[in-house]
């Protein structure tokens, strides 16, 4: 096994993590005004430049609202957040997501993947179909959950690319972190056979230009992870 290089977090990263944890834990409530940058720097023993850069990044994620000549306030991240916010929530929960967020991700994935199939099947080339089969074959040989999760994501992302819609691959890719986390969880709970069969069956349906069958495979597969025999949240 090859081990990766370890690196210590920067002061800014530590500052961001601590403040986000205070917000996500509820110790800092929505609407609460933060101390001044100078007070934060003094109490946390960091420079004002670290505080300033950290607050800007946290605000960009939707956790804070910085009002000129007024101060910095805790924002409702459910209303103002974005994908980076979701990654912070995952880190706070030890790499997992609340059940409501898992359900939401699965629902979004179903909508995006079905749209990708609908757009891709009428225009997909033989070479693109070959790429999908190659990705499916790699999954058949993979027995490590992290790598297998990457392959499943790659397969679905290829579908988005082959759809011809210029925005669909970008939107789908923005959900990579939570999606691969859920795939890893799926493989740890249920093994690899179900996802291998699903991926190969989609390839066969696409090769036959059979959108109805491909859609049925995707929808049934995701519905099973929501409320069926391969459910991946409580």
Predicted regions mapped to residue ranges:
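Conserved amphipathic alpha-helical segments that form helical-bundle/coiled-coil interaction surfaces
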Residues: 105-184, 195-199, 213-224
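A short secondary-structure junction motif
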Residues: 22, 26, 81, 166, ...
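C-terminal effector-binding regulatory domain of bacterial HTH transcription factors
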Residues: 1-2, 211-234
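Solvent-exposed, non-membrane alpha-helical residues enriched in polar/charged side chains
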Residues: 20, 24-25, 160, 203, ...
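Short linear motifs at protein or domain termini
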Residues: 1-108
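A broad structural signal for alpha-helix termini and local helix breaks/kinks
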Residues: 44, 163-164, 233
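Short acidic-aromatic low-complexity motifs
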Residues: 206-209
């Amino acid at each position: 096994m090859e081990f990766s290089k370890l690196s210590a977090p920067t002061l800014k990263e530590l500052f961001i993590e601590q403040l986000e944890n205070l917000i996500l834990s509820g110790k800092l409530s929505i609407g609460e005004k933060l101390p001044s940058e100078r007070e934060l720097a003094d109490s946390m023993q960091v420079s004002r430049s670290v505080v300033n850069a950290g607050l800007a990044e946290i605000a960009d994620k939707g956790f804070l609202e910085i009002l000129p000549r007024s101060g910095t306030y805790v924002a409702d991240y459910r209303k103002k957040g974005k994908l980076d916010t979701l990654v912070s929530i995952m880190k706070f929960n030890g790499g997992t997501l609340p059940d409501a967020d898992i359900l939401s991700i699965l629902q979004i994935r179903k909508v995006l993947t079905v749209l990708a199939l609908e757009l891709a099947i009428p225009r997909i080339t033989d070479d693109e179909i070959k790429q999908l089969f190659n990705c499916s074959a790699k999954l058949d040989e993979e027995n490590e959950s992290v790598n297998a999760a990457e392959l499943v994501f790659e397969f679905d992302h290829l579908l988005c690319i082959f759809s011809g819609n210029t925005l669909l691959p970008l939107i789908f890719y923005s959900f990579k972190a939570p999606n691969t986390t859920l795939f890893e969880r799926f493989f740890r709970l249920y093994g690899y056979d179900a996802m291998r069969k699903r991926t190969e069956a989609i390839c066969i349906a696409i090769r036959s230009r059979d959108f109805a069958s491909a859609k049925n495979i995707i929808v049934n597969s995701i519905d099973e992870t929501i409320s069926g025999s391969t459910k991946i949240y409580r």
